[in-house]
Amino acid sequence: MTSGPPPPPRQPDLDDDIVLLAAFLLSSGHGLLDEPPAYGPARCADGARRALELLDTHGTPDPALTRVREQLENAMCGSMADVDLPSLLRTTCDQVLDVVMARRAGASRLL
């Protein structure tokens, strides 16, 4: 016997997409064993972009997170020589954390 209500059913596509994200992260880690160190931050940014894409596809799209995903896509699709990757990572991380903090502040006001 389990306690609490059963978890909500998940969409098979979401499960597959999460597994594919895990495979991407694992293959990225493996690739980094032989790739130049500078590839690591770009692969992490692409992993974040893929995770945010899952939210857009399977969740309730959040305009602020969609903008972050689009910033990452624009950086990843262009010439990486033109991208200030440290600044992009710092800025987009701050933007994602701002969304989380705003959500939590809103949820605590409802209690």
Segments (PLM) and residue ranges:
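Short terminal alpha-helical segments
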Residues: 2-39, 93-101
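Amphipathic alpha-helical interaction modules
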Residues: 28-74
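Amphipathic alpha-helical binding modules
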Residues: 71-111
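Charge-dense, low-complexity intrinsically disordered segments
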Residues: 12, 35, 59, 79, ...
